[in-house]
């Protein structure tokens, strides 16, 4: 089972490299070589460091040796921006552990929803976690057509008074 811990600023290069490896490994299962190349090219260490240091909640998963297995983030408004798992951690439920930490954090913060733009590959993970499909985004990035899905999960915290 992976260990979850908060992101540390010294981690910036590692999640960026993991992001690229993840996109290149999993991407071809649902996207063309051109789409995968464009997606992987969006990785940038400085941008990762800026994003992860801007106050959002960032959690990383690591193995016993301290190697990064995945990472995820949640912005203050409930937007889950990134959730990536290393190819060598496939089928170890790292994505589920990361998502669980994200949702627990959102609930502790008093949020009532999480929303995401999920890739074709991530959509099933979010559907299994109770997300609703809101629509498909058809995008052109750097001249390449690609798509993702707008999804959200809402919950209501209920207070029942007068019950034991």
What positions do the PLM features span?
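Conserved catalytic-core motifs of GNAT/GCN5-like acyltransferases
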Residues: 115-117, 132-150
């Amino acid at each position: 089972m992976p260990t979850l811990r908060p992101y540390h600023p010294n981690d910036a290069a590692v999640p960026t490299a993991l992001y690229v490896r993840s996109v290149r490994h999993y991407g071809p299962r649902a996207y063309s070589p051109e789409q995968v190349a464009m997606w992987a090219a969006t990785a940038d260490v400085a941008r990762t460091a800026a994003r992860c240091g801007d106050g959002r909640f960032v959690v990383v998963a690591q193995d016993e040796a301290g190697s990064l297995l995945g990472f995820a983030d949640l912005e203050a408004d409930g937007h889950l921006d990134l959730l990536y798992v290393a190819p060598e951690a496939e089928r170890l439920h790292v994505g589920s552990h990361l998502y669980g930490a994200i949702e627990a954090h959102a609930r502790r913060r008093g949020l009532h929803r999480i929303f995401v733009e999920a890739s074709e590959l991530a959509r099933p993970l979010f559907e299994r976690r109770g997300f609703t499909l809101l629509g498909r985004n058809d995008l052109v990035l750097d001249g390449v057509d690609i798509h993702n899905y707008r999804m959200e999960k809402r919950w209501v915290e209920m207070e029942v008074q007068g019950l034991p």
